[in-house]
Every structure is written in C-alpha cells, then in structure tokens.
Amino acid sequence: MDRKAGEDDWEDSGAETGGSDYSRLSSTSSELSVDDTQDPFLVSIHVITDPGESRCLQEAIDRLLAWIHPDLQLFRVSERRVSKKRKPVKSFVSHPALAIILFLQEAYGEDQILHLHKCFQKPPWQFHHTERVHGKFLPYMPCNQDFFTLANGTPLWAIRQVHYGKEIIRFTIYCSYENFADMMKMYELILKKRVWRKKTDFCVFPVYSNMDFDIEFSLKRLAKGQKPVPLESSLLEFRVRDFGQLIPLLPNQCSPISEGRWKTEDHDGNKILLQQAQCLARKTTWKHQNYLSRNPAMTQPLSIAPRNRKFKSGKHKGRAGNGQVQHFGGSQMDFPRGQTDTLRSLKVPSESVQPFQRSKSLYCLPTTSDFPSCDSFPISETHLCFGQETYETPVWRSSPRINIDDLEGVEETDVDTGMKLSSSDLSVISAYSPLNGLCSDLEASLPSHGALSHSNTLPYDSLHSLSHISSSSCSVFPSATGASTLTQAHILGHYHQSSETTSHLSETLNVQEEEEEFYI
C-alpha cells in the first residue's frame, strides 16, 4: 500500500500495534459497549483438521495461550472424517483472512518472547511470511514481524511486544478494500460493541477486558488488488443474544445447523457461526450456590500452585526492601486454617509463599438478569508470589473433551461438509454449549457435607476434578488452580471494590493520554 511520507499520515496495520492508547482505553471499554455484560468467550474459533491431527494442533494452541491465561480456551480443534484436497493459492495476490496476534509484556523478560519464537520453529508450526511495515519504528527483537501457521486453511499467528499497558489477544480479519466499511458495520451488529479505535484502514472492537489482559477483535483493510482468502478449515463463532433481531440485518443468508446455532458468511465469504448465548440452567446454578451457602469452607480462598510468570527485579520485583512480599494486582489474603497441610503436600515452604490475586476485574455481576449467568463467575485469578526469583514453565492443560453421551438425540449440520450428523458421529461440536450432564457431574465431584464438617481443607484431587469440569463449561464455575470460590455476598463486595480500583486506574491513565507508541 502506498503511504505518504508524513508521520501524521502513517496508517496502522492493525496486526502490529499494541499498548499505548489502545490499552488505556481498554480499561474502560465496558463504557463503550452496547451490552454491559463481559464475556471472555464472546469470540472463539473452530479449527477443522484432517484425521489424526487434532490433538497435536490443540496442544500447540493451548501451550501458546497458557502464557497469558491457562483458562482462555478460545480455540477448539476437531477432525473431519476424510482428508480434504486443497487447491493451491496464488500468494502474491492473496492474503489469509484471519490472524491471531498475541501482545506480551516485555517487562516479564525477553526470554519469554524468545522462547515462544523458538516454539514457532518446531512442528506443527510453519513459517508463513514476514510483514513489512512502514512508519514509526521502535527497537524490537528479531522475527517480530514474522507470521506462522499450524496447517493449511488455519489462521496466522504472531507474537508482538508490549512496552506498557496490558497483554492482548487480538483476532484480526483482513478485509478487501471495497468491503471494509460494510464489514465494520456487520461485526458491530454481531458483537453489539461500538468501534472504539478507528483509522482509515483499521478498527478495533473491545471483546473483554480485565486488569491484566484484553481480548480484542479487529478489522484490517488490505490494499487495492489484494484479496483476502477465507480459511476453509477455520470458522469464527460469536455468541449472540437475539437471533430474531440480528438475522434480518445480516448481508447473507443464515441457515440453522442446530437448535441454537446458525451459520452465515460475511461480505468477503468468511464462514461464521452464531451461537445462542445461553446460561446454565437455573437449577444447576442455584444448586452450586446453595451448596456454597451450606458449606462455608468452600467459600474460603485456596491457593494451589504458582502460575507461569517470572517477576523480575525492578518493576515487578517480588520482595520489598523491608523484607515483606509485595502483592501485585489485588489485595492480600491470608491462608485459612487447614490449608497449611495442602501447601506442605505440594512441597512448598509455607514461610516463603504469599498468595495474591492478579486481578479482581474478572468478577462481572449481571445487571439485568434475575439469576446468575455465566459472566457472574470469574476465571481463576489467584496466584502465589515467591520472594525469590524463579522461572516456571507455563502450567497448561489440554482442552476437555465433550462427552458424547450427554448429546444423545442431538442432530447438527456438519459445518465442514454440510451433512446432517447425529450425536453418534458429531465431528464439529461447539465447546461452549451447555451440557445436560454437567449438573450431575458437578454434584458427583463435590465433597459431601459430612466430609467438610470435619475439615476445612479441600482435597487437591477433588479440587482438580472440579477444575476439569469447570473448564469444559467455559469457566462457569471458578477453576481450581488458585481460584477463590465466593458466595454471592462476597462477590458483590468484591465487585464494588474492583469498580473503585478500575475507576482510580482510569483517572490515572487519562493523565498519560499525550503519550503514544505504535508497536510494530
């Protein structure tokens, strides 16, 4: 694309900017949202692979996202029953239509980003291309403009640095020059979010925001003559609330593939899925809440093991000069009685461990619903901070598999072949649909009332089982890895305190509006 030499005319490519005013606005992105309820799984991606390749690709994606948060399972990989032959694409006039860019804090150390770049050099990752960007340059590490892919027909991936601000997961759709404006209006309808950052060839929609990271959805206009190539093995899925109001406004025909899911295309031919935003059944949610109210021991914070970050000296130094441990991103919490044994069983010296919570802003209480929704419960955010500097490999877990027994009688259209499928041979299943068997599985995994009356300590094995079920239901219930299970009253007080913290942070960030960096 031809660009003017003037610095003011520099256009943001969308795939290489992070931090700066984007991050400052993201802390107050809920003010710009049409729908006040935040959902970290509002946008997700389905990847369809040839037989025998799904496990390898799913693990590669999970390892990558674990550097930001292990519970962010935004990608689901499934297999088609027969391998698909693909036609070669002329690369000099085409560009893959979808990319995922991870913006990581350089304050955690360059070793982290270098490690991820080394991961891209190993299978199943494949080098795709290097992007050339014009404009204002800042010092960056090698390979900062490289894009990689997992397989043909899957999205591009890239790692970028963030000098300040929060870490970002950004979904980017590359649009044709002619359709950029129309697609911006279409996705504004689907997301029910206003564009809060826009340039002539780039715009950003806020999807989810907390104190540590943002999830964004962006559109990038290609130059004249370039054509975005829709990915034949990947589909974007969006949670929507009102099918009846949305479907007549979309540019292309919508066809149902199941009771709660529809498929359609955007102006450039990208296949997208629309899922009815459903919460767990009232019975299941209230069962969980009533269980917590009957068992106060379950409401106490429990910290299990440290996560993946290395706190460096200086900005992120773990121990202050007076010998006391500093707590980052949240308030200090003491261990409840009975958890000392849990720490000892993990072989962690209790005197060297202090729990802290990175973020409180994941607690999002519903404002209009009369019963708790999926957004009322947090992704697990409690971690342990060590006084001594240690470097830990990111803790990640593979995505839970869907129990086919819970889908008895279900019929759905295969989004890959268009054929009707029964529950016995479903090859493409939404990982975020509520499962009928969740209530019984959850109740079976929880300890009995009598067991809790004798001890306030929750066994690690039982807690791990609960965490596994939690992750399969899009983190509806707090995850076990350092999660704090709270009653509704505790959550409400926690929410008010978080709102005051976020408000104070927004006022501080507004003072810095004159600073701006473009991350290339």
UniProtKB/Swiss-Prot annotation:
This is Protein FAM124A. Belongs to the FAM124 family. Residues 20-32 have a biased composition (Low complexity). Residues 1-34, 311-334 are annotated as: Disordered. InterPro entries: FAM124, FAM124_dom. Pfam families: FAM124. It comes from Xenopus laevis. It comes from the Eukaryota.
